[in-house]
Each structure stands twice: as structure tokens, then as C-alpha cells.
Amino acid sequence: MNIHEFGKENKKIILLIHPSVVKWDYFEVVIPLLQENYHLLVPALPGYDFENDSDFSSVEQIALELNGWIKANGYTEIYAVYGCSMGGSIALMVTLGQMIKIKHCIMDGRITPYQLPWIVTRFIALKDYLMMMIGRTGGVALLEKAFATDDYSKEDLQYVADVLRHCSRKTIWRTFDSCNNYKVPESVPKLSTQIHYWYAEGEEKERKLDINYMKRKFPQTKFEVLPKLGHAGLVLLKPELFAEMIDKLG
């Protein structure tokens, strides 16, 4: 797995994990805002790395590989792990691995594991997979119907279409199957990490089950509503607010 590093001279380390259907350069707007004060680790996740012909494995496997890479490179403490959507699921599993000390774990619109019968989760994963395959085939014209075009430009949607065309069928299937069904330990270990769950004002209804899950499973979670945004919009549409929220973690 390729890990891109910025601001290596800084002491505080932040791990930034991108969502699905984008590349690591999802963070290109916020990197200049953060690299003066933080050492940034930005992985190019398998299946979404244009420089590495690989397939997505699973949320759990990627979290294990990230923990292994961080430890092997001599880093003993992470100031914050931030993950958006799929990246939030990986961020949590990195934290639960407890291989390194992590001060903050931030999940932005993270999708929690479905609490549904196995066969139902198969149908949901299949629906998501087919939607992405249709988007890959239809390109921008179909993606414009699937996204709120007031929030995302035609160039943004072209970017998503290009990423989808790069992704293998295996990557697309595993992404949705794993994000919907990754395994959080039944008995959560005691954590010294502060857990944060951020979600956009425009997705509050869609995240209701996820919010309830976090309250039940991780009662210490600090919740933050992101005003006037939709899912995964913070980094792309309000990078200055993102940097400000990182600075305020304490």
C-alpha cells in the first residue's frame, strides 16, 4: 500500500483515510492547510490507487496493514485518525487494533455494520454494487442524476466516473460488502482514544441508525453536526472548516 507523507518535520501525526470511489487526492485541498502544523499520512487504499494495480480487500485487512505500516516505520503515537464514510470504518478498526497510541479517532459519516440478517445484507450489497456498475458504464450523465449537482461540479462527477472506470468489479463488490458487514468486536476493548462522530446536516436522517449504533456501542463518542453539507462534503466543499475542526481537537 502506498502511503503519501507531508509535513514530516512536524511532531503531531494525522492519518487521513479517504472514502470509496475516490483516490487519495481527495485530500489535496486540505493537505496545504494542515501540513505546516501536522505530519500527514495519506494512504492510497488498495483498489483505488492508480499507481498500483491492486484490489480492495476488506475494512479489517486494510486497517491491519495500516497499523503494521505505522508500527514498522517507528511511529508510536498518532494524534488523530480521520476517515470519511468507508474511511471512517477503517479509522475505527485501526483504533480498535490498539497497536499504537491514538489520541483522536474521527469518523465523518461513517457507515456502521448493518444489524440485519445475512441474506438481507447480500441484497443491499448487490444493489449498491449494481448502482456503481451502472455509474461506471453510464459515466457523468448517470452520475449527475445520482448526486446533488448543486454541491458537486461536472468536473467532480467526471473524477468519480474516472475512478469507477479504474476500479475492478472485485474492488467495487468488496467495498460495499465489507463496509456494510465488517466485524466490530462484540466486547469493545477499553479505549484511551477520544471517539468523534461527525455527520452532515443534510444526511442526518440517513445516519440515524449509525448514530444510534455509536451511542450504544461507544457511549463516550462526541457528536458534531456539519452545517449545510451533504455526505462526504466537508473536505471537498469546506476545507477551511475541516482544518479548523482538526485544530480544535485539543
Regions found by a protein language model. Give the residues of each.
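Short beta-strand/loop motif that positions the catalytic acidic residue
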Residues: 191, 197-199
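Conserved HGGG/HGGXW glycine-rich cap/lid loop of the alpha/beta-hydrolase fold
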Residues: 4-52
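Gly/Ala-rich beta-loop-alpha elbow adjacent to hydrolase catalytic centers
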Residues: 83-87, 91
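Flexible "cap/lid" loop of the alpha/beta hydrolase fold
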Residues: 96, 102-132
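Acidic catalytic loop of the alpha/beta-hydrolase fold
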Residues: 201-206, 232
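Conserved alpha/beta-hydrolase catalytic His-Asp/Glu region
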Residues: 116-118, 136-189
